[in-house]
UniProtKB/Swiss-Prot annotation:
Protein name as annotated: Maturase K
UniProt keyword list: Chloroplast, mRNA processing, Plastid, RNA-binding, tRNA processing
One GO molecular-function entry: RNA binding
Family recorded in the similarity comment: Belongs to the intron maturase 2 family. MatK subfamily.
Described function: Usually encoded in the trnK tRNA gene intron. Probably assists in splicing its own and other chloroplast group II introns.
Keyword Endoplasmic reticulum: no
Location relative to the cell: Plastid, Chloroplast
PANTHER family: MATURASE K
Naturally occurring in which organism (per UniProt): Picea mariana (Black spruce)
Pfam families in the cross-refs: Intron_maturas2, MatK_N
Amino acid sequence: MDEFHRYGKEDSSWQQCFLYPLFFQEDLYAISHDHYLDGSSSSEPMEHLSSNDQFSFLTVKRLIGQIRQQNHSIVLFVNCDPNPLVDRKKSSYSESVLEGLTLVLEVPFSIRSKYSVEGMNEWKSFRSIHSIFPFLEDKFPHSNYVSDTRIPYSIHPEILVRTFRRWIGDAPSLHPLRSILYEYRNSSESLQRSIIVVPKVNTRFFLFLWNNYVYECESILVSLLKRSSHSRSLSHGSFPQRTHFHRKIKNIFLFSRRNSFQSIWSLKDPNIHYVRYGERSIIAIKGTHLLVKKYRYYLPIFRQCYFHLWNEPYRVCFHQLSKNCSSSLGYFLRVRMKPLLVKTKMLDELFIADLITDEFDPIVPIVPIIGLLSREKFCDISGRPISKLSWTSLTDDDILDRFDRIWRNIFHYYSGSFGRDGLYRIKYILSLSCAKTLACKHKSTIRVVRKELGPELFKKSFSKERELDSPPFSSKAAARSQRERIWHSDIPQINPLAHSWQKIQDLKIENLFDQ
């Protein structure tokens, strides 16, 4: 890859003319086969991995020969593995060819993204998903409207090919990609004309498609804003291995659908803040209600014009922070007024001023968490703990570890909220459900289980709470920690309840507008 970068600096046209011959290099598929084995070693059983030891490059040569033939170009999703032990849907040969195609297409994409990032002086490379909560705490108090929407992920295969065609001059190299996308669409159970580009399966090909799709969406949007506003404060960058972006847009011009290159009204005073995490994006706006209505109209039109995506208008919904709470990231997000006393001393006089500031106040959704726990059979719909019958076949240590992990993740995730008193109700449900599960396993009662295990029943379980909630500092530091938020860097990945709750909220919005 370093040689590609060096040659790319010397001759930019060389980057776009060498891709197609790489498809017929055997060394490329040897590398991709190793990547396939490394990626599947943790998920596939050992008998499947042993069959991959008989991987034959003669079969790969035959596949390359079929790719050369126009009538047999769609062969990548056909089982070519002679070993019947390997599942037809997980053919190592097809996966190796697919990995090889991805490696070739990643070369110009990585070069292009590297050069685009190097030219942005204002771009902060440390911005990632870990900066989402500090971003909300910093920007929400200065915004009055917020929107949390899901990025459209169903797109026609030809649109994906056109996104590659914009920056790859080697047109023949896109023919295998087009064949793969259309064959994948035809092989799916649904009869829709579009495919799902969101990486639900952790494969290199779909991760690359998703990164390129998101990069193209956001780069075109920001470039249009630059072209219209001529503002030097706008910055944009991309990281193929980081799918999370953070940028601030100060001055923008919005366009009409008929004439997208002539500004019809300009916005100088409002501020628009944008951040993306995973498959969703948050837009915080400081402006008038008219601005929000126009932006709500502009965003679906932009996606429809440039990517032929029909984005339902109800999916772009803005909430007013001063009146309503916005559900996002597993929180109820709101902004509340906070009184502030300021004392200023000038010479012998003391001035006291009472100020009112806006403060970001995330609320822990206790009732939705209890509802999700009831769906997972930890309690009933009213919050009464019940035994987890599916875990009675596990050992006592495994049961305690699983309950401990659930509580630690929940408490860790909501550690940035001031009002955490409701979390102790969640702790009560989990602790009593753990005791009932152990009692059901040993065919006894909760009293007998506590009497037999004694204080060691919950000695290990729920132990991380004291480490997080009571830092070993002085009394002043402990009192200050109660007034300050502590956002832990690993919280976006450890709470699946937040993702489940967000899906339920999206379904409620869809059902509301369908009625």
